[in-house]
């Protein structure tokens, strides 16, 4: 009798100066339940634990001058070495780099895991980014104080795509940005609220008409583009 090969748990490794930020909202709702059920695992490392001096120094002033401080490559390299057992791509959250989107989330969901580095200060020494072959990934054209919020957003979008996390595959297929379209508006009880009624077609029971109206909304352009 053959025993089934145990399923590899999708694992996220996070290197951060603020480990208490995790799991944060990832420990709640759908992602939190999936974490409790062992569908995915989270390993968080405090970058400061890998400092090379007794003062736990993790940053230094940039060569060439300029404002702010830069995360040291030696400290971050030691951190990444300690998390080398986590499989998958290495990603540095940064205002520059590839824009994270739904297609990217799907890519990561098909990986065995991912390691995320949460930047702080003025950024990370470029040498460790290159030496560790990290991908630089951005959530958009804006600046956050650090990469922790970006890391949580990236993981939330990815974890919900893992098998067994969302109960309805149809629900995933119909979400916004699948096939490049936006999700249609949703309505629930009460039927009339503050003088506003649910569209009559949704009350008709005619599934063909409902599908047609839904598709019309799907094809409307997003104002965020």
Give short role names for the model-derived ranges:
Residues 216-222:
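Conserved small/polar residues in nucleotide/adenosyl-binding loops
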Residues 13-15, 43-45, 89-91, 114-115, ...:
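Hydrophobic/aromatic beta-strand patches that form the interior of the parallel beta-sheet core
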Residues 29-34, 106-110, 131-132:
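Short, solvent-exposed amphipathic alpha-helical segments in soluble enzyme
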Residues 124, 128-177:
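Structured adenosyl-cofactor binding patch, chiefly the S-adenosyl-L-methionine
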Residues 48-53, 98, 143-146:
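A short acidic, often aromatic-flanked loop/helix-cap motif at beta-alpha or helix-coil junctions
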Residues 2-83, 203, 208-211, 218:
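N-terminal nucleotide/polyanion-binding subdomain common to many enzyme families
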Residues 160-200, 212:
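Surface-exposed, charge/polar-rich loops and edge strands
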Residues 71-120, 125-126:
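S-adenosyl-L-methionine/SAH cofactor-binding core of RNA-modifying enzymes
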């Amino acid at each position: 009798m053959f025993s089934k090969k145990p399923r590899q748990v999708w694992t996220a490794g996070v290197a951060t100066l603020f480990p208490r930020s995790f799991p944060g909202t990832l420990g709640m709702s759908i992602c939190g339940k999936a974490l409790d059920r062992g569908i995915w695992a989270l390993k968080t490392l405090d970058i400061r634990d890998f400092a090379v001096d007794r003062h736990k120094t993790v940053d230094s002033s940039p060569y060439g001058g300029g404002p702010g401080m830069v995360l040291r490559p030696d400290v971050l390299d030691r951190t990444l070495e300690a998390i080398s057992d986590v499989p998958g791509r290495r990603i540095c959250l940064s205002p520059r780099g590839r824009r994270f989107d739904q297609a990217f989330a799907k890519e990561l969901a098909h990986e065995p895991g991912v390691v995320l580095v949460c930047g702080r200060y003025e950024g990370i020494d470029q040498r460790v980014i290159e030496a560790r072959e990290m991908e630089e990934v951005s959530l958009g054209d804006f600046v956050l104080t650090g990469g922790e919020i970006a890391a949580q957003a990236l993981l939330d979008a990815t974890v919900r795509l893992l098998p067994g996390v969302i109960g309805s595959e149809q629900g995933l297929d119909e979400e916004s940005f699948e096939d490049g379209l936006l999700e249609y508006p949703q309505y629930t009880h009460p039927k009339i609220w503050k003088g506003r009624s649910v569209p009559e077609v949704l009350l008709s029971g005619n599934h063909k008409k409902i599908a047609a109206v839904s598709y019309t909304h799907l094809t409307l352009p997003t104002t965020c583009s």
